[in-house]
């Protein structure tokens, strides 16, 4: 009776009752943060999950299973991405095992082949295959390079805080622009939605996040 009120069954990627469509990612992140300590503590379990997750992601991108759910939204098909970031950190700090390093390199090579052969040549892909593969192929070397540089750039913290707020509020910016009828030009729409999303994110940081961080810091002193 009470459990059904706490569970959302995902039957649509754009449900009419969803005020913040990207909020599904919070669920995936919470699950990942529960799983990561276990998967990183037990290395062989982590590597097994890493490969199983990538296989699920691949099956989704071939449209064998639901490409949107299992290749983009739900934890079984994306936990390998979280593990990729963790393995990058371990590689840079010299704590990664040879199997962890090799697995990350192999998956990167497979993903590069996938992009060239299946997407560019064959034109075969599922929902968000292009976006997630491109993010993976650009993100892994970029994050590795930034971790190796170990240099703190100006505005790093601010941009880091803004990024997730922009992601969560970008639909709001689309709806505002649609309401005021400013969606005719795609370039101006992208520019304006970025400004609106960044402004909303900055307000949330200033009015809520910074105050919560201050309270949290005082509690842990």
UniProtKB/Swiss-Prot annotation:
It is found in: Cell membrane. Coiled coil: none annotated. One of its GO terms (molecular function) is acyltransferase activity, transferring groups other than amino-acyl groups. Disulfide bonds: none annotated. One of its GO terms (cellular component) is plasma membrane. It is a multi-pass membrane protein. Pfam families: Acyl_transf_3. The keyword Transcription regulation does not apply. Keywords: Cell membrane, Membrane, Transmembrane, Transmembrane helix. InterPro entries: Acyl_transf_3_dom. Its main location: membrane. The chain crosses the membrane at residues 33-55, 70-92, 99-121, 125-147, 154-176, 186-208. This is Uncharacterized protein aq_1078. It comes from Aquifex aeolicus (strain VF5).
């Amino acid at each position: 009776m009470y459990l059904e009120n706490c569970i959302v069954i995902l039957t649509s990627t754009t449900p009419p009752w969803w005020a913040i469509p990207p909020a599904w990612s919070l669920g995936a992140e919470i699950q990942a943060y529960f799983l990561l300590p276990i998967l990183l503590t037990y290395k062989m379990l982590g590597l097994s999950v890493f490969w199983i997750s990538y296989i699920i992601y691949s099956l989704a991108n071939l449209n064998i299973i639901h490409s949107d759910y299992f290749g983009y939204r739900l934890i079984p098909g994306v936990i390998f991405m979280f593990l990729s970031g963790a393995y990058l950190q371990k590689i840079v700090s010299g704590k990664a095992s040879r199997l962890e390093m090799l697995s990350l390199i192999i998956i990167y090579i497979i993903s590069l082949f996938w992009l060239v052969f299946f997407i560019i040549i064959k034109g075969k892909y599922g929902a968000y295959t292009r976006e997630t593969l491109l993010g993976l192929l650009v993100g892994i070397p970029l994050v590795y390079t930034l971790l190796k540089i170990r240099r703190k750039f100006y505005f790093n913290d601010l941009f880091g805080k803004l990024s997730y707020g922009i992601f969560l509020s970008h639909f709001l910016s689309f709806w505002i622009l649609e309401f005021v009828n400013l969606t005719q030009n795609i370039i101006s729409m992208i520019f304006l939605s970025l400004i609106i999303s960044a402004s909303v994110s900055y307000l949330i940081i200033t009015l809520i996040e910074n105050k919560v961080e201050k309270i949290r810091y005082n509690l842990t002193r």
